[in-house]
């Protein structure tokens, strides 16, 4: 019998409205993105036109939480911008 693991996702949304990132984590990426797009998430409710530009997958919840916290901090946000530079350029994100 095989093992069953829950997967945890750290994801980055980009708002075409205010040109800002939203970083979060979830167990069900598809459902969570739908919640964001339909205005069910308080922190992104007023940031319509959200697009998923990046995600990572983790088996351990603690690892996903740790990574989310890092990406929300100064060094993590800076490294994320460098990593996603091409994507952000195509979206005309000005703050590289």
Task: Put a short name on every predicted segment.
Residues 1-41, 48-51, 55-57, 63-72, ...:
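GIY-YIG nuclease catalytic motif and its immediate N-terminal context
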């Amino acid at each position: 019998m095989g093992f069953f693991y829950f997967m945890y996702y750290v994801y980055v949304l980009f708002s075409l409205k205010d040109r800002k990132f939203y970083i979060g984590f979830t167990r069900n990426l598809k459902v969570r993105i739908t919640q964001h797009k339909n205005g069910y998430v308080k922190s992104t409710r007023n940031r319509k036109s959200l697009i998923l530009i990046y995600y990572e997958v983790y088996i351990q919840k603690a690892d996903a939480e740790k990574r989310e916290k890092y990406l929300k901090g100064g060094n993590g946000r800076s490294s994320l911008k460098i990593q996603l530079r091409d994507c952000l350029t195509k979206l005309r994100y000005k703050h590289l």
